[in-house]
Amino acid sequence: MKTYLAKPNEVPKKWYVIDATGKPLGRLAAKIAVILRGKHKPQFTPNVDTGDYVIVVNAEKVVLTGKKLDKDGYRYHTKYPGGLKFIPYRRLLEKHPEKAIEIAVRGMLPKNRLRDRFMRKLKVYRGPNHPHAAQKPEVLEI
């Protein structure tokens, strides 16, 4: 018996809606990363995009446990000497809650060419509304 290798056009893509209300950021991001990669499907192939689309609503209601709101955060470098910047999660969630979820999911995806393709399939919105009703997304409970 030969090993099955999926081709990108033969794996059907589904749309899922996830409500982030009261969900811990890390656990939510881990589940989203699995769905984006397609690891929940029997046709999973590591070098092929077999994942589904994910819509996250109510991004501003995601929670962090413990003291992570002030202690942890998003770190980046401006490429100038002494240009290391740090934004605590408290400030990031106040101003750009959708960015916090995108950063967490991006860190849980493989660091290769497919990561940008996976990230294009992630749609994060503040509030309960989203413009993807035409795709008839399934509600996914996490």
From Swiss-Prot:
This protein is one of the early assembly proteins of the 50S ribosomal subunit, although it is not seen to bind rRNA by itself. It is important during the early stages of 50S assembly. NCBIfam families: rplM_bact. Part of the 50S ribosomal subunit. The keyword Ribonucleoprotein applies. Keywords: Ribonucleoprotein, Ribosomal protein. Pfam families: Ribosomal_L13 (PF00572). GO terms for cellular component: cytosolic large ribosomal subunit. It comes from the Bacteria. GO terms for molecular function: mRNA binding; structural constituent of ribosome. One of its GO terms (biological process) is negative regulation of translation. This is Large ribosomal subunit protein uL13. Belongs to the universal ribosomal protein uL13 family. CDD domains: Ribosomal_L13. Gene3D superfamilies: Ribosomal protein L13 (3.90.1180.10). It comes from Caldicellulosiruptor saccharolyticus (strain ATCC 43494 / DSM 8903 / Tp8T 6331).
